[in-house]
Regions:
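Short beta->alpha transition motifs characteristic of CBS
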Residues: 30, 121-125
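Core segments of cupin and vicinal oxygen chelate
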Residues: 2, 8-50
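Vicinal oxygen chelate
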Residues: 12-15, 67, 72-118
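Short glycine/serine/proline-enriched coil/turn segments at secondary-structure junctions
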Residues: 35-36, 62-64, 101-103
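Arg/Lys-rich, alpha-helical DNA-contact motif
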Residues: 49-53, 64
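Residues that flank catalytic or metal-binding motifs in active/ligand-binding sites
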Residues: 3, 40, 51, 68-70, ...
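Active-site beta-strand termini and strand-to-loop segments that position acidic
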Residues: 44-49, 111-114, 124
Length: 125
């Protein structure tokens, strides 16, 4: 049976992006200073999750992330507490009505990473 292992995104500043995703609960589990293609790589993972987010920085590459290209999703047992924590740190949580309950009783919100990738925050439980 196949297993979904990782998702790779390009980033404009590897250290800045690692720090940003740490605020969401990710840990940097591995770094490669220079791949055979000349990229700097970091592999992030939420403890207990099998999926890995691979960050790829290529010196000299002009990063442009088209709006609504893709998003990742992270679940939290207390979405209100996580969003309040992020807002206190200056993160913009959207849409404005994220506190409403959506179909099937769940709530969701979004936050945008430093390069423009959207991260969906889902209430779990």
């Amino acid at each position: 049976m196949p297993v979904f292992l990782h998702t790779r995104i390009r980033v404009g500043d590897l250290d800045r992006t690692i720090a940003w995703y740490r605020e969401l609960g990710f840990e940097c589990v591995r770094r490669i200073p220079r791949s055979p293609q000349g990229n700097q790589l970091a592999f992030l993972q939420i403890p207990g999750s099998a999926h890995v987010l691979e960050l790829c920085f290529q010196p000299g590459y002009k990063l442009v992330v088209p709006e609504d290209l893709m998003h990742t999703a992270v679940g939290y047992p207390d979405l209100t507490a996580k969003c309040a924590e992020l807002e206190q740190k200056g993160y913009a949580i959207w849409p404005a009505d994220w506190r409403q309950t959506f179909p099937k009783g769940r709530r969701m919100a979004f936050v945008t990473d430093p390069d423009g990738y959207e991260v969906e925050l889902l209430e779990q439980g």
